[in-house]
Amino acid sequence: MSVKIRMRRMGAKRKPFYRIVVADSRAPRDGRFIEEVGYYNPVSQPKELKLDEDKIFEWLKKGAQPSDTVRSFLSSAGLMAKLHDEKYNK
């Protein structure tokens, strides 16, 4: 089972709201997921992003692969650098 960290679209038409979830890669975008680890609201000013860093870090250590967009969010939050440091600077 390949696990991905990706965004799940919520909200109304033309008013998107995304939940960042851990899901099986074979599940549909808005389908079944394992755990919710954050959210992103692109409509609000300023854009709102909340990440549960502890949960995300645990899933990344277990081998979950983030989508490209989620990877950019994690990089801006400093989680990818933290994971890299822990993995290679033992």
From Swiss-Prot:
Protein's UniProt name: Small ribosomal subunit protein bS16
Similarity annotation: Belongs to the bacterial ribosomal protein bS16 family.
GO molecular function annotations of the record: structural constituent of ribosome
Source organism superkingdom: Bacteria
Alphabetical UniProt keywords: Ribonucleoprotein, Ribosomal protein
InterPro entries given in the database record: Ribosomal_bS16, Ribosomal_bS16_dom_sf
One GO location term (cellular component): cytoplasm
Pfam families hit by this protein: Ribosomal_S16
Annotated organism of origin: Lactobacillus delbrueckii subsp. bulgaricus (strain ATCC 11842 / DSM 20081 / BCRC 10696 / JCM 1002 / NBRC 13953 / NCIMB 11778 / NCTC 12712 / WDCM 00102 / Lb 14)
Any one of the GO BP annotations: translation
